[in-house]
Amino acid sequence: MLTAKQDEVGRELRVATGTSLIEYPVKDWLLRRQPTEWEALLGEAAIFSGQDELLWGPFVACVYREPRTTRLNCLFMDRIGVMHLHSVDVSDTSRFYPAVENLRPEYRTQVVRRCLAVGLLKKYVLLDPSAVRLIRAELPYDYDQTTAGDLANTCELVEGQAARDVGQLLVRLGLVQPRHVRSLMLDVVYENHADVVDANNKLVYYLGEQLEQLFDPLTEYSPEPTELSYRVPDQVRTSLSDEMPLMVSICEELLQLQTNFTLSLVGFLQKFLIPLRIKALNEQVPGLSTVKLNNIFPPTIDEVTRINCIFLDALKAALPYGSLEVLKACSITAPYFYKAYTRHEAATKFFSRDIKSFLSTFGKSLSDLNFYSEIKLDTLIHGPQEKLTKLKLIIDRLFDSKDWETNEEQKEADRCYRSICDVIDSFGKDEPPNTYDTRVFTPSGKILTELAKGWPAELQYKWLKRRVVGVFDVISVTDPESRDIVVIFSDYIVFLHVINGNLYYSGDSKKPLISDVLMNSLINEVPLPPKIPKLEVLSHSYIDDVVVSTYGKNSLRFDTLNAERPSSVAYTLASSSVEASYVADLCTKARILEKDTAFHLFKTAIDSFHVYSTAHESEAYKTERIKSPFVLFLNIPDSIGALQDHNATVGLFASLNKNDKVTLVRLGLDGSREESFASLDNFLSLIIEELLIFYPSYLSSATSPLFQQLMQINEQLVQTLLDPKGVHSASKSKCALRTSKKKKMPANLVSTNDNSRTLSPGTIISRTPRTISTITPKQEKRKSVGQASNSPARGSISTTPRKHKRESILGKISGLFHKKDKKENKRNSVGSDTRNRHDNGSVHILRNSSSSFRELESPRQMKRFSSVVHTAVPSSSKRRTSGISPSKGTVNLRALQDAENDDNADISKIPIPEGESLFDDTIRVDGVDADFYAQKDRLSKIYNHDLYGEVVPSAPGSKNVNVVSGATREQEKQQNTQKAIARELLASVDQQKRQPTHSAPAESQIVIPGLPQSNVPQINFGRSPSFIELFGGMRLVLDENDESVNWRRLCSERSLNEKYQIRPATYAGCISGELAPPVGIISDQRDSNLSGDNDADTPLPMHSSNKSILSDETLEKGEFERDFAISTPKSQTVSDVNARRETWGYSHSHDEEIDSEKRANTKPVSAPAPNVIPGLIITANSPTKPWHKENTRIKVSDVRSEGTDVSYISSLKKSSNRLVELSVNSQEDFEDERHTPVIEPIQNPEAPSLIENTETAPVASNSSNEETLSKLLGSQGVIDLTEETIDYSSINRKHASIQTAYPVLDDVEFSTFHMSFGDMKAEDSHLANQRESYLFSNSTIAGKKDESHGPVFYKLPDFVADDSYLGYSAVDQHAKHERNTEIGEEDEAMWVSPSKLDIFDLSKQPESVYKRTSIPAKHAELLSKMRKDGSVKFEESMFIRDNSYVYLGQFLSADEVIEQQDKKLAANTDEMDSARRL
């Protein structure tokens, strides 16, 4: 466990890894032994490796002779850590000797084997039994002397160099020496109440120094030490005087350039910057602090000046000895430019902007320093890198102009010249264009070149927030010859492997560290230089999951403690200028940067131990993601509920008393509570003590909530000890499989880490990984031996299609028309992609029971759009593993049934890499994907893939699907033992056999682009929010001759539809006289397509037809079979449809039957599809396609009242080639926990299953069908778009027949301005008494409240005797009802075209003509009455926007009936009202 230590150096967290996770008695001097002593002892030790299935797992045992006692000691490394056994007694007097008696006879004479047996028994006895139960709750058998002896018999001796390597790795991995955690984050929580503000401020004052910024450039900047410097040669070969005049001139030019630039930098520091710094420190410049000054003129300029001085000294020393020595001096000094210049560039990125503000603010205070103008300052700050280009040009001339005398000089000069060029080119050089899928976007959006192979998908987005904290060169402790890179971001830590890194660093010349080059690329947004070695990602971890500890000489260990994949990796820093504690401190700062809520920052530094305290407000802290397990609560009552609210393991509750004493209560989740008191001066010391007590137990003890993760990490370390390079290389190949070969992700891809339904442009899901169990190789071996006699030989099964070179477009198109060879088909279908078949180190088997598919963990598991489309199986569907016939892609259902009845059938133990399925092909029943119809949530298959991917995807279920050839009947039995799936599929097939008219063809045909399909998919499309927003306020159609852009819906206000029920909801209507059946009758079709599991969740098909409506030539049949439920198979005939119609109780004319039969028997060749529109049902969630339609007249309900998305009407005689864009459900509409759909599906949990209820229930009558469907449409949020014949209520049935007999659009001459009169009916007299006053008193207010949704045309109500234009009287309700019916019979709706109206006047008369127009006298009195009477009110708010058109009724002449009613009404008015109106 970890122990707290305080010594003369200071306080620190000491991780004593010499102890195990479970406490046991151990000698203290064993734990304090130095690493060098351990290396000497373990180098001579006898090392054994073993595997214990009961408790210890894989373990390593070291038996060595202790120098102090000359007796045998034993050291064990297993899943609970390192355990020391001192002075092991192997004599027969030992109480552990029975373990020796259980050894083999040949082992009983070996002392080391006897010590091993005794040690295995003794270590179990020393451990606390309650702690042993944490390893395994219940032991299947006792761990006793027999178990220990047998385990010692099975241990293998590690001999030779391997044994010495294990001993060294025990030290290098930090397993036998203390590890330290010197940097921690402490969360402080306070409540923002006025009564505790002062007390909180007093307490946080003692938490340390409050920091304004997390990174201080002054304290954290350290110049790079010059390890190599130029020295003049001992023996003089040549001198500058011996050179040609041209060479002398070039060398002197180089020296002069460097002299002038260096002197200008030195003068800038001495005359301007240093005096200005002194003034800022002395506060002589008002408002100018040191921090502000260093932001403008960063300290990096000092380092740049220092490097230039070193370079100038080297040139001066080398110049007398000739051009070759000048090149040597440049090659030795140039590498030191890199780090200084790149940091200076990053620090002065915004200097040109900041200097203007600086001079305008403080220019007057710098009057004595004004000889440096803005332009001169800008030139000096940005000058260093500009001078590098000039230096390179001069060196190029120097190297090219010299004729080297000997080959030795030529080689030496060439080496120096190449070294100089590589360094200067490392600052950034143009590269040829590269693909974007392996590039990374910088915070400003600039694209970098490929950083590394297998770049994690988690780091391909959020670059606007991500910051680069540090990049470091490291050396792996498992392979000292290997060079790696550690990149610390603000949210992730990435470990990169440098491919052939030893070659890059080999040689005499000093090269820039790859970490510095990478830092320059990330910070300054420049491409990587071409000479940098290739990098690949080893692993990456979220910053909050990583615990960094230091040990030895500049060594670090990164432990990832998440529940999913705990891991550990150890490195040694390659540069001696960087300390391991500094890297660990940066990781703590990165965690603080990842916080997403506001906080106050405090820092406490006690020697090498740093504590960063982040103070959060209590309510805001509840939403924080990055939290510390130990939380300090200020003036908050202690309670376990407070710990649970903030996800804290232990809380320290501090409250300030009146006498400035602090009461501290330490409370754990287990209820343990300790109380202590301290003064304010000792408050911080007491907090540090509590941290030193908590974190050792939290990071390495049996009581830690991370105990399981810690045990898994120890198991990995044991594997590393036994096979260090194998684990190291395996991790690389595993990562390459995960990121590079499995999926090359585009760098700008945004993924939801966690849901397969969230897609990104350019990708499709080609395969869903299965949830599979893992067993160890030893378990697999043991299980396979027991099954060897019962299992036949099993051939390899192809799981992925072979990936060929991408074909051209012409090749793809030509491949659709010629018949492929059988061998070619077999090769394409059975071939495997070996690049995708990598084993991750474990053997996978399938479970006995059907398991659910695992959702995609990350976008890495998505595949690019390929030439073979694999149907994505959602996570909600059950896994289907079926026996596949060698010749067909259909399911061998009888083999499934036999396997179900076979008691001896077992699941085959087939290794399956993660993310791959056993079979590529999904189960198909008569050419239809059964898995597709079992889905609960289907994805939209809209093409949003890579535009440069494969051109023509083949439909699933086509001839070239993957099949498994050569499988015997026994193999099929073993591969298909999922009983539930077999029963479901057999039931589905039996239903299809009972319904022969609905059987689909056994195999799908490839659809050639350009030919329409003859079968009609069931189309469900959803409402587009943008469509409703743009067209929700418009009305429908005027006349056919009008422009298509003017076709909007007239009439039928929402108030009329809803309030008076003019058009009640009815069943889905007919197309060309063909009526859709009631919903319940469709169950016979649906049963053949849908599994019974998902009846409640799958959208119901509402219409069936045998006519093709698709002429979108780019869409293939296979795609529609996946996108939409095909309710009508090819074999369905017109007679079948007619027979069903008669059953439903509907009929159509004989002419329509003949016409329908002709259309059904006509085979489409190249002509467009028939001019028929299918029954369309709007649902809340539906995919969208562009449809090219030639359709008949359709009556569509009001857009506003019914929520319709489409409004479109055409003539019977004239085809309209119009593309209708249906509503597109964007990616945000997919059901994802992080993406809320724009329109949620309307669920009706109370609605019974239609299929179950209607299969046995007979169809009673038309009215019952209508009632059933009306309820369904109301509950599902569905409206009728295709109804042609409307069955109105009995009171309006006569009016409905007239509308049907006289269609409103048949007469195209109604293209002038007409008013249409509806058939509104009043419900009560209260409405008539309130409308008149409301009409005029509120017209102004109503006009302000309601926005115009033009073009809008309105319909006036009937002018009957009891109407007051919009008001009704209750004189004779019965008579009014009869008049409404009569007028409905006589009048019909009249239509108007907006394109035929002048914007001001229809007759194009001047405005003065209408100014002279007066209101008829017979209407003047009534108009005056309506203006004065304020009692008239509207019950329906939708009438408000009709008010502005009421005045038009005054210009229409009324008939005699209306005049009589007006006179009668005026005679009955009392005298007071008459006087008031006059």
Curated annotation (Swiss-Prot):
Stretches with biased composition (Low complexity): 763-777
InterPro entries: Bud3_N (IPR021895), DBL_dom_sf (IPR035899), DH_dom (IPR000219)
Lineage of source species: Eukaryota, Fungi, Dikarya, Ascomycota, Saccharomycotina
CC terms in the record's Gene Ontology section: cell septum; cell tip; cellular bud neck contractile ring
Record family assignment: Belongs to the BUD3 family.
Annotated protein name in UniProt: Bud site selection protein 3 homolog
Coiled-coil region: none
Positions with biased composition (Polar residues): 749-761, 786-800
Superkingdom of the source species: Eukaryota
Chain residue ranges for the region called Disordered: 732-889, 1085-1106, 1146-1168
Presence of keyword Cell inner membrane: no
Subcellular location: Cell tip; Cell septum
SMART domains per record: RhoGEF (SM00325)
Summary of the function given for this chain in its UniProt record: Required for proper septum positioning and septum construction during septation. Acts as a landmark to mark sites for future septation, and as part of a scaffold that recruits components of the contractile ring to the site of septation. Not required to determine the site of lateral branch formation.
Alphabetized SUPFAM superfamilies for the sequence: DBL homology domain (DH-domain)
Keyword annotations of the record: Cell cycle, Cell division
Basic and acidic residues bias (residue ranges): 1146-1160
Disulfide bonds: none
GO molecular function annotations of the record: guanyl-nucleotide exchange factor activity
Transmembrane listed as a keyword: no
Protein encoded by which gene: BUD3
One Pfam entry name: PH_BUD3_C
Biological processes, Gene Ontology terms: axial cellular bud site selection; cytogamy
